């Protein structure tokens, strides 16, 4: 089980990561990682950002049948 400090340190070392990758790296359940990231965000230590993947061929994401599949939420330290 990871601690809040370990999550912060991993973000500091990697720069930007998504919650799934943090969960895998620290061998910690996803709900716990999400809770810790939300806590870091509330403390003003981390921020979430949306990243658009470059796999969109049509350019019309609003009407895309994939919905939000081309969006990825990443976290970084402030």
Swiss-Prot record:
<comment type="function">
    <text>May function as a transcriptional regulator that controls feoABC expression.</text>
</comment>
<feature type="binding site">
    <location>
        <position position="61"/>
    </location>
    <ligand>
        <name>iron-sulfur cluster</name>
    </ligand>
</feature>
<protein>
    <recommendedName>
        <fullName>Probable [Fe-S]-dependent transcriptional repressor</fullName>
    </recommendedName>
</protein>
<dbReference type="InterPro" id="IPR023732">
    <property type="entry name" value="FeoC"/>
</dbReference>
<dbReference type="InterPro" id="IPR036390">
    <property type="entry name" value="WH_DNA-bd_sf"/>
</dbReference>
<dbReference type="Pfam" id="PF09012">
    <property type="entry name" value="FeoC"/>
</dbReference>
<keyword id="KW-0408">Iron</keyword>
<feature type="binding site">
    <location>
        <position position="56"/>
    </location>
    <ligand>
        <name>iron-sulfur cluster</name>
    </ligand>
</feature>
<dbReference type="GO" id="GO:0003677">
    <property type="term" value="F:DNA binding"/>
</dbReference>
<feature type="binding site">
    <location>
        <position position="64"/>
    </location>
    <ligand>
        <name>iron-sulfur cluster</name>
    </ligand>
</feature>
<keyword id="KW-0805">Transcription regulation</keyword>
<keyword id="KW-0678">Repressor</keyword>
<dbReference type="GO" id="GO:0051536">
    <property type="term" value="F:iron-sulfur cluster binding"/>
</dbReference>
<dbReference type="GO" id="GO:0005506">
    <property type="term" value="F:iron ion binding"/>
</dbReference>
<keyword id="KW-0411">Iron-sulfur</keyword>
<comment type="similarity">
    <text>Belongs to the FeoC family.</text>
</comment>
<keyword id="KW-0479">Metal-binding</keyword>
<dbReference type="InterPro" id="IPR036388">
    <property type="entry name" value="WH-like_DNA-bd_sf"/>
</dbReference>
<keyword id="KW-0238">DNA-binding</keyword>
<feature type="binding site">
    <location>
        <position position="70"/>
    </location>
    <ligand>
        <name>iron-sulfur cluster</name>
    </ligand>
</feature>
<dbReference type="InterPro" id="IPR015102">
    <property type="entry name" value="Tscrpt_reg_HTH_FeoC"/>
</dbReference>
<keyword id="KW-0804">Transcription</keyword>
């Amino acid at each position: 089980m990871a601690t809040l400090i370990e999550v912060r340190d991993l973000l500091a070392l990697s720069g930007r990561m998504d919650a799934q990758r943090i969960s895998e790296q620290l061998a910690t359940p996803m709900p716990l990682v999400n809770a810790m990231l939300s806590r870091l965000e509330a403390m003003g230590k981390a921020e979430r950002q949306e990243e658009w993947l470059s796999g969109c061929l049509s350019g019309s994401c609003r009407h895309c049948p994939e919905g939000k599949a081309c969006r990825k939420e990443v976290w970084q330290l402030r």
